[in-house]
């Protein structure tokens, strides 16, 4: 029955995408992931200065960053096509499914990346363009080609590339590196392991079938649950740094502590739970947590500004 349903889904998908091939290329960019990255990039832009940056800079900066993120996602589709066909979550992807050829995926990625870097270097600044290129290569090459299949710490090491967008947004506005911008990167860097390991617990069998050495596959569920708790504690500590450095005020401190307590509760619940769906619930909550934390940052930054900006 499952095979029949899967066959019918494939037929329906093929019929739709044959009529609307642009949808396949849109899917190639992982739009949901890119949108999350652009939200964090926008947060970086809005936090970089006491008053909002010009609209044209926000639009062009995020356009360039978004195109480069889409380029990296397309490379991920290309490299992972043999793995994607083994996983229920990804077997329908356009390259894995054969709807887009590897050559066309590579050309599409090169086009997006080239245009994105041109926008950043021509209209924003060279620093942002170079940092975006480094992030693109870090995700598409270092993580996707090597780390993902090499070590269960793939998410920890490779998470730095995915944590870069707020810094890219920050440098797009200021044109220079800043410790506060790096703090935003550190927050996402600490958030990434518990976020993805929670999903890996739920998708453990699929990762094992595909040969991806995610932590639950190599070290077991109990070990992974414990590390989710430990990294959540680290995350909470990291989120206090913006207050400690006077980047943020008391409004942020209260919000960060409340949200952190909620995340820790979820992590502890996952630690003792035997329900496999609890991993998925923790994964979903982690996304809400990150967005809520950044909203609190914006509220604190604009409604309760500290007297002396910076350190």
From Swiss-Prot:
The record's keywords, sorted A to Z, are: Cell inner membrane, Cell membrane, Heme biosynthesis, Membrane, Transferase, Transmembrane, Transmembrane helix
Q: Which regions span the lipid bilayer?
A: 33-53, 55-75, 104-124, 127-147, 155-175, 181-201, 228-248, 252-272, 287-307
Spell out the CDD domains in the cross-references: PT_UbiA_Cox10
Q: Which pathway does it operate in?
A: Porphyrin-containing compound metabolism; heme O biosynthesis; heme O from protoheme: step 1/1
From the UniProt record, give one GO term of the biological process aspect.
Answer: heme O biosynthetic process
Q: Name one GO molecular function term.
A: protoheme IX farnesyltransferase activity
Enzyme Commission (EC) number? 2.5.1.141
Q: Sorted alphabetically, which InterPro entries does this protein's record hold?
A: Protohaem_IX_farnesylTrfase, UbiA_prenyltransferase, UbiA_sf
Q: Which domain of life is it from?
A: Bacteria
Q: Does the keyword GTP-binding apply?
A: no
- UniProt keyword annotation of Membrane present: yes
**Subcellular compartments:** Cell inner membrane
NCBIfam families reported for this sequence: cyoE_ctaB, PRK04375.1-2
State the name under which the record lists this protein: Protoheme IX farnesyltransferase
Taxonomy of the source species: Bacteria, Pseudomonadati, Pseudomonadota, Gammaproteobacteria, Cellvibrionales
Name the gene that codes for it.
cyoE
């Amino acid at each position: 029955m499952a095979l029949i349903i899967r066959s019918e889904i494939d037929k329906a998908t093929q019929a739709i995408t044959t009529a609307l091939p642009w949808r396949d290329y849109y899917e190639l960019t992982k739009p949901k992931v890119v949108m999350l990255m652009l939200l964090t990039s926008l947060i970086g832009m809005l936090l970089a200065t006491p008053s909002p940056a010009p609209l044209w800079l926000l639009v062009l900066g995020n356009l360039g960053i978004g195109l480069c993120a889409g380029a990296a996602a397309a490379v991920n589709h290309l490299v992972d096509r043999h793995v994607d066909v083994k996983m229920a979550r990804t077997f329908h992807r356009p390259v894995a499914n054969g709807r887009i050829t590897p050559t066309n995926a590579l050309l599409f990625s090169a086009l997006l990346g080239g245009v994105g870097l041109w926008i950043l270097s021509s209209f924003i600044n060279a620093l942002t363009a170079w940092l975006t290129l480094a992030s693109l290569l870090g995700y598409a090459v270092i993580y996707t080609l090597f780390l993902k299949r090499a070590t269960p710490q793939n998410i920890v090491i490779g998470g730095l590339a995915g944590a870069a967008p707020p810094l890219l947004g920050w440098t797009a506005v200021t044109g220079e590196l800043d410790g506060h911008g790096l703090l935003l990167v550190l927050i996402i860097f600490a958030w990434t392991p518990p976020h993805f390991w929670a999903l890996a617990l739920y998708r453990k069998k699929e990762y094992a079938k595909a040969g991806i050495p995610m932590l639950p596959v190599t070290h077991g569920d109990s070990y992974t649950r414990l590390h989710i708790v430990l990294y959540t504690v680290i995350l909470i500590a990291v989120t206090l740094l913006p207050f400690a450095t006077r980047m943020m005020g008391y409004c942020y401190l209260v919000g960060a502590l409340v949200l952190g307590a909620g995340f820790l509760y979820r992590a502890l619940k996952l630690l003792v739970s035997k329900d496999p769906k609890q991993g998925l619930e923790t994964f979903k909550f982690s996304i809400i947590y990150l967005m809520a934390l950044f909203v609190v940052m914006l509220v604190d930054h604009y409604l309760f500004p500290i007297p002396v900006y910076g350190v």
